[in-house]
């Protein structure tokens, strides 16, 4: 039985989760067999964005409408997501990697360990340089923290050095990456992180 790496992508609304999944799919799709599950409360907006962007063939992208708190669908009752993963694994066996993008949530959001193997947590500079020191499991326990939209720092009065310092303080030796997903800056580091785990 082949093992599919399941990678959860979480973070607040507007932080860049879908942009990250889109960029990763486009960068990895020629080397790995991929699929995506997205979570939205009442729509399939993120799934539709990925289809329009041609991140992957549309049949490899499944949108889950959670109908309530996005946290519940990835933690307390992950059944909708587990069913979507099973559907993709059955239809496209063998797969190497499935991204599970959570709905936008707060800093306390975490994935159920039965749902994903790795978690990437995305925050953005526009929310202010205080975000890393606010903590929460996404900041402190995710396998990779992505600090996105670093190009906006001067416009929102955020100090990237403060963010780096606070991130190191909150995460210890857990990795983090500073990105500007609009230009692709830092994306290679996220890809390198995933490639190590895909090779394991």
Swiss-Prot record:
Its main location: cytoplasm. CDD domains: UreG. GO terms for biological process: urea catabolic process. Pfam families: cobW. GTP binds at residues 11-18. It is found in: Cytoplasm. GO terms for cellular component: cytoplasm. GO terms for molecular function: GTP binding; GTPase activity; nickel cation binding. Keywords: Chaperone, Cytoplasm, GTP-binding, Nickel insertion, Nucleotide-binding. Signal peptide: none annotated. InterPro entries: CobW/HypB/UreG_nucleotide-bd (IPR003495), P-loop_NTPase (IPR027417), UreG (IPR004400). HAMAP family: UreG (MF_01389). Belongs to the SIMIBI class G3E GTPase family. UreG subfamily. PANTHER family: UREASE ACCESSORY PROTEIN G. Homodimer. UreD, UreF and UreG form a complex that acts as a GTP-hydrolysis-dependent molecular chaperone, activating the urease apoprotein by helping to assemble the nickel containing metallocenter of UreC. The UreE protein probably delivers the nickel. Facilitates the functional incorporation of the urease nickel metallocenter. This process requires GTP hydrolysis, probably effectuated by UreG. This is Urease accessory protein UreG. It comes from Thermosynechococcus vestitus (strain NIES-2133 / IAM M-273 / BP-1).
């Amino acid at each position: 039985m082949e093992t599919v790496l399941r990678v959860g992508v979480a973070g607040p609304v507007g932080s860049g989760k879908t942009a990250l999944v889109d960029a990763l799919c486009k960068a990895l799709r020629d080397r790995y067999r991929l699929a995506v599950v997205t979570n939205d409360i009442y729509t399939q907006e993120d799934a539709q964005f990925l289809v329009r962007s041609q991140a992957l063939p549309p049949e490899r992208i499944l949108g889950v409408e959670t109908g309530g708190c996005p946290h519940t669908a990835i933690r307390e009752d992950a059944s909708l997501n587990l069913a979507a993963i099973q559907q993709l694994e059955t239809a496209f066996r063998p797969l190497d990697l499935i991204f599970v993008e959570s709905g936008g949530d707060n800093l306390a959001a975490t994935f159920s360990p039965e749902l994903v193997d790795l978690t990437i947590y995305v925050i953005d500079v526009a929310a202010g340089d205080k975000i890393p020191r606010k903590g929460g499991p996404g900041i402190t326990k995710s396998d990779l923290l992505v600090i996105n939209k670093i190009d906006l720092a001067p416009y929102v009065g955020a100090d990237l050095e403060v963010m780096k310092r606070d991130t190191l303080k909150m995460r210890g030796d857990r990795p983090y990456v500073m990105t500007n997903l609009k230009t692709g800056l830092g994306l290679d580091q996220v890809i390198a992180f995933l490639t190590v785990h895909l090779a394991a």
